[in-house]
Curated annotation (Swiss-Prot):
This is Tachykinin-related peptide 4. One of its GO terms (cellular component) is extracellular region. Midgut. The modification Arginine amide is found at R9. It comes from the Eukaryota. It is found in: Secreted. Myoactive peptide. Increases the amplitude and frequency of spontaneous contractions and tonus of hindgut muscle. One of its GO terms (biological process) is neuropeptide signaling pathway. Keywords: Amidation, Neuropeptide, Secreted.
Amino acid sequence: APSGFMGMR
């Protein structure tokens, strides 16, 4: 999954 997924948290 893209880093954006973790960045959203």
